[in-house]
Amino acid sequence: MNIRKNFKIKFIRLFKKLSILFLLSSFILPSERNSSFKFSQHTDIDSWWISNNNFGKNFKESFFDFYHTRTLGKAFFKINITNSYSSNDIPKFGETYLRYDFSKNTHLIAGRFYRTYSNYMNNELSSGHMLISNNARPMPKLGLNGKFKIKRNKDVYFSWGISHAKFKKNQYYTDAPFLHEKFVYIHYNFKKKHFLSVGLAHEAIWAGTTTEIGSINNPGNQPDTVKDFLKVFISADGPLIEGEKHANALGAHSGIWDFNYFKKENGKELSIYYQHYFEDTSSLRFANKTDGLWGIEASNYFKNTKILLEYLNTSNCCIDPPYQNDNYYWNYQYLDGWKYENMIIGNPFVNNGGPRDELKLIHLGLSYTLENKKINLKMSKINKTRWQSDYSNKIRYKIAYSFFIQSINVELFYGDDKKNNSGGFNLSYKF
């Protein structure tokens, strides 16, 4: 049974019907809604932190964004329309989705959205989540999420989710592959001020049709039946390919062990986290040691200030071949790797220069707010990389200052990475 075309047709039809129905009813019935329009103007050469972690948008000299959110009963709708995804100014959807709450603990979400786990992440200041950051345009997805509590202990609960998404055709894929996503977390609340969560998130590229250039081994139609999906779900082995010593897992897999400690007391917040990255059984068992993203964020320890410090390590990806020998975000069959529309889906520093571009990175994020004024700073420095260059250890930063003129929010920004420097402004109006 081939499920690729069948799923695509049904998903598109369902999302269009739900979107039209929701929009029409939201204008008729009472609801909570917010709308805003944003115009941006800046130089045509982009530095690192202006072109990365900005929702995959192609920052031209000028572009616009329209945002709208609406709550109607058990339904929530978010829409972003922008011309920054097209070279010819054609408006396209950014983060746009419909969420429907079946109950207090279960909801369906459909459209273009990022992730529904690792909610502790500060996407505005972070260098980027290890699996799904705001670096690329959100993929079209259909997901079901929920949570349930332990009856004997009200301080413990589980959260879970499963999603199905689709990539796009490109030079590597004549028929775009699917993305399978799932996660499960356990959360513990201690004395209502200490929170601990531990979870496992899993992503897998599967199905599709790869080209000769797009697949070093076994190009052509990739396994895509329901039986194959079940293998992808449990990371079971696919067929043995000629020349290989053993069968590999079906599809291209990646995931994280996700640890977070959160404390809230006297108006102050502290979050400590570690995302241990893995792509196979060996790295799942920590054979790649401390690879992944470490972070700490402190809020209001200095009044109206958020300080975030992160350490990114990918230097242990290939320390024990063939046992521990992962090219993070890359795959021998799905050669476009962990990308969507030519942008890395996860942390933009990971293998951005190509396979085995191992690195150690320090990242600082800072935010200060006073009344209607705000300053944001992001600063990153690679301390070690496999492919050393004069550019590798340079500081890359972006600073932004925003304020209000009547009802218009004005943001001025400047970025520099020692190769390029660029600046500009954003004007936002909420109505």
Give the location of each predicted region.
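Outer-membrane beta-barrel initiation region
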Residues: 31-70, 247-255
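Extracellular loop and loop/strand-boundary signature of outer-membrane beta-barrel proteins
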Residues: 51-54, 82-84, 126-132, 168-173, ...
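Bacterial Sec-dependent N-terminal signal peptides
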Residues: 1-32, 427-431
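Outer-membrane beta-barrel pore domains
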Residues: 240-431
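A conserved mid-domain beta-alpha-beta active-site/ligand-binding segment of alpha/beta enzyme cores
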Residues: 195-257
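Short loop/turn motifs that connect adjacent beta-strands in outer-membrane beta-barrel proteins
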Residues: 31-34, 68-77, 104-108, 149-158, ...
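Transmembrane beta-barrel strands of outer-membrane/channel proteins
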Residues: 35-47, 79-85, 108-114, 158-166, ...
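Outer membrane beta-barrel
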Residues: 76-170, 174, 178-207
